């Protein structure tokens, strides 16, 4: 059988080990071929090919539920569930999503793009099953560092206290979280654990001894029974046993015979079970095996060399690169500066700080809540913590931002990379909401640069601001190629905007990444006889009302432009300020409406949302041709 013939995972039933190995090779070939062409997550999926095949051969996926953590591990799952013919469209507009999506397939039982959610979701499904008196299996597959997230540990703690709820957790240990040895001893211990006679002895030991000596030594029996149960458990497994799980493993995650035997046996164990599978991230592609962090995810690349496809022309440095370089220079001069990341050093540019000043760098793992409150503690002691995080992941620490930072007005700088449209990763990763969810918080200041040079200024501004927390958002991708400063940066005055273009017909207020597109739109409007004043707002909170309100009243029409959600966003802030002063002028808000933005290139998404320069100009032209509403 060829992989292309598999449209349902139950077709794996009955295949020989040799046939499964052939399917495994075909999965890796298709995975590599596709990601090299489209970009995407490379290492995680390559590491779980045999795990997926072995598990799915032991399940009935017309009934059973499998929940993949994060979702970027699940490319093999997609190839086995009817998406082979469309897999070449991975992460492309209207193509196969890069993460799991309940709308895309009946086998995507739970959507996920953020880490550490699978065990909680699986436990909910298992409890629903039990309520209905059903008997199907529920399996959560977690790993690739996701076990460092507090939510997964909360779920394990809860599930471990439900001895009558059958739930299997498969820990894909690819050395990104924990990594015990795999070998002959481990296989022997695992075999011993699964031996029915050993299980019978450990579960019935107490009753057998009581039969002969009575109840007088019950406390000692409990300790003896616990010791027997832990006899064959590797050290790491004892932790899960103490939390109420039956621990099985570690198992060689690339040995199909061992995986199938282990899963079949583990399915028979009642209650919560954890199967520990040791895998190699990037398995089957030597370049990715050697550089597991670098090949976690890739842009399109040359499969033979592993190198990125050359660009048609040189590109300016990315915002992340400018951020990392600038923060490192500032940290060299100020030992109070501490860069904090939640397992995203390379993506955020903090790997530059890590390399040059490791003592001023902290990686907390996938633990955003901890990162924020730890930063609050650092700020209490006079340090200058810089929490560097993707906009979408900062959502995970909202209570900590409110309770531990804002209420105490602590000087924590939040640097939100990937703010706005991020592209191929889709709705789980769009950075659309940060303006809205942070603007409502007392003591919070919000700013966004128009280009990479202003990013440098704002980074200096944030580090020097001591009156409370400050949020700095900036987009994914490359800057505009403007000249960068090497030193001598001065903080910007808080809450002050700048006028970039003068005109007498209307006021255009742009925030962050939309400043340059708005300037281009103003030029198009000029060609149509409309002269716009363009303001780089710089700050969404506090607004520069001393500048904005008189201009709005004088010019009589306002347009706001932002790369964020319209509900509660920058445009809403402007409307509120105008209303508070009873300045009743027409306001057109341009931004992201109340929809989910699916995976596509950033340019495709912006065109779909009406955020190109030409579309902004068209929207303004359409509005200016309408009579202004009465101010009465």
From Swiss-Prot:
The UniProt entry's GO biological process terms, in alphabetical order, are: 1-deoxy-D-xylulose 5-phosphate biosynthetic process; isopentenyl diphosphate biosynthetic process, methylerythritol 4-phosphate pathway; terpenoid biosynthetic process; thiamine biosynthetic process
Q: Record keywords: Metal-binding included?
A: yes
Kindly tell me the pathway this chain contributes to.
Metabolic intermediate biosynthesis; 1-deoxy-D-xylulose 5-phosphate biosynthesis; 1-deoxy-D-xylulose 5-phosphate from D-glyceraldehyde 3-phosphate and pyruvate: step 1/1
Q: Which cofactor does it need?
A: Mg(2+); thiamine diphosphate
Q: Which top EC class is given?
A: transferase
Q: Name one GO cellular component term.
A: cytosol
Q: What is its EC number?
A: 2.2.1.7
Q: Which residues bind thiamine diphosphate?
A: 72, 113-115, 145-146, 174, 285, 368
Record field: catalytic activity? D-glyceraldehyde 3-phosphate + pyruvate + H(+) = 1-deoxy-D-xylulose 5-phosphate + CO2
The record ties this protein, via InterPro entries, to: Dxylulose-5-P_synthase (IPR005477), THDP-binding (IPR029061), Transketo_C/PFOR_II (IPR009014), Transketolase-like_Pyr-bd (IPR005475), Transketolase_BS (IPR020826), Transketolase_C (IPR033248), Transketolase_CS (IPR049557)
Where, by residue number, does Mg(2+) bind?
Answer: 144, 174
Keywords of the record, alphabetical order, are: Isoprene biosynthesis, Magnesium, Metal-binding, Thiamine biosynthesis, Thiamine pyrophosphate, Transferase
Please share the entry's free-text remark on the cofactor. Binds 1 Mg(2+) ion per subunit. Binds 1 thiamine pyrophosphate per subunit.
PROSITE patterns xref list? TRANSKETOLASE_1, TRANSKETOLASE_2
A single GO molecular-function term is:
1-deoxy-D-xylulose-5-phosphate synthase activity
Task: Summarize the protein's role.
Answer: Catalyzes the acyloin condensation reaction between C atoms 2 and 3 of pyruvate and glyceraldehyde 3-phosphate to yield 1-deoxy-D-xylulose-5-phosphate (DXP).
The record's annotation in NCBIfam families points to:
dxs (TIGR00204), PRK05444.2-2 (NF003933)
Q: What HAMAP family does the entry give?
A: DXP_synth
The protein's assembly and partners: Homodimer.
Q: Which family does it belong to?
A: Belongs to the transketolase family. DXPS subfamily.
Put simply, this protein is called 1-deoxy-D-xylulose-5-phosphate synthase
Please report the organism this UniProt entry assigns to the protein. Answer: Cyanothece sp. (strain PCC 7425 / ATCC 29141)
Gene that this polypeptide is encoded by: dxs
């Amino acid at each position: 059988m060829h992989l292309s013939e598999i449209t349902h995972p139950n077709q794996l039933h009955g295949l020989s080990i040799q046939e499964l190995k052939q399917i495994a090779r075909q999965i890796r070939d298709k995975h590599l071929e596709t990601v090299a062409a489209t970009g995407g997550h490379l290492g995680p999926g390559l590491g779980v090919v045999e795990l997926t095949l072995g598990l799915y051969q032991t399940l009935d996926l017309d009934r059973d539920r499998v929940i993949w953590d994060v979702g970027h591990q699940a490319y093999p799952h997609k190839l086995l569930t009817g998406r082979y013919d469309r897999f070449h469209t991975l992460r492309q507009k209207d193509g196969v999503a890069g993460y799991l999506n309940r709308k895309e397939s009946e086998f995507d039982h739970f959507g996920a793009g953020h880490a550490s959610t699978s065990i909680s979701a699986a436990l909910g499904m298992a409890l629903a099953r039990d309520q209905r008196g059903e008997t199907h299996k529920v399996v959560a597959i977690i790993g690739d560092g996701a076990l460092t997230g507090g939510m997964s540990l909360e779920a394990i703690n809860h599930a471990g206290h439900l001895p009558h709820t059958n739930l299997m957790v498969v820990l894909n240990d690819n050395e990104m979280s924990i990594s015990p040895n795999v070998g002959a001893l481990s296989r022997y211990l695992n075999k011993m654990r699964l031996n029915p006679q050993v299980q019978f002895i450990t579960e019935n030991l107490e009753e057998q001894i009581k039969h002969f000596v009575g109840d007088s030594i019950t406390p000692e029996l409990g300790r003896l029974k616990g010791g027997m149960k832990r006899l064959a458990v590797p050290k790491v497994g004892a932790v899960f046993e103490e939390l109420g799980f039956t621990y099985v493993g570690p198992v060689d995650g690339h040995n199909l015979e061992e995986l199938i035997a282990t899963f079949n046996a583990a399915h028979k164990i009642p209650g919560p079970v954890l199967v520990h599978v040791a895998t190699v991230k990037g398995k089957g592609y030597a370049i990715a095996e050697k550089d597991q962090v670098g090949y976690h995810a890739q842009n399109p690349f040359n499969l033979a060399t592993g190198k990125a496809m050359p660009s048609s022309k040189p590109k300016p440095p990315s915002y992340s690169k400018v951020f990392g370089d600038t923060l490192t220079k500032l940290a060299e001069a100020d030992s109070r500066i501490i860069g904090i990341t939640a397992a995203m050093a390379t993506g955020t540019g903090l790997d530059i700080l890590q390399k040059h000043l490791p003592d001023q760098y902290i990686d907390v793992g996938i633990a955003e809540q901890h990162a924020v409150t730890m930063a609050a503690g650092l700020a209490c002691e006079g340090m200058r913590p810089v929490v560097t995080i993707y906009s979408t992941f900062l959502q995970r620490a909202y209570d900590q931002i409110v309770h531990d930072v804002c209420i105490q007005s602590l000087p924590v700088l939040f640097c939100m990379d990937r703010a706005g449209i991020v592209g191929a990763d889709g709705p789980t990763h769009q950075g659309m909401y940060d303006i809205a969810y942070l603007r409502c918080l007392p003591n919070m200041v919000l700013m966004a640069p128009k280009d990479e040079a202003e990013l440098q200024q704002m980074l200096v501004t944030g580090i020097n601001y001591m009156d409370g927390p400050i949020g700095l958002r900036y987009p994914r991708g490359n800057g505009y190629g403007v000249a960068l400063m090497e030193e001598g940066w001065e903080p910007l005055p808080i809450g002050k905007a700048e006028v970039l273009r003068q005109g007498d017909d209307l006021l255009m207020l742009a925030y962050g990444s939309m400043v340059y597109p708005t300037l281009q739109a103003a030029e198009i409007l000029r060609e149509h006889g409309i002269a716009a004043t363009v303001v780089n707002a710089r700050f969404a909170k506090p607004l520069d009302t001393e500048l904005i309100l008189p201009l709005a009243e004088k010019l009589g029409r306002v347009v706001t432009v932002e790369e964020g959600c319209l509900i509660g966003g920058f445009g809403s802030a402007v409307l509120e300020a105008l209303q508070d002063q009873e300045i009743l002028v027409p306001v057109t808000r341009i931004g992201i409406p109340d929809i989910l933005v699916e995976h596509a290139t950033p340019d495709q998404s912006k065109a779909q949302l009406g955020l190109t320069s030409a579309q902004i100009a068209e929207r303004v032209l359409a509005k200016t041709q309408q009579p202004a509403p009465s101010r009465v």
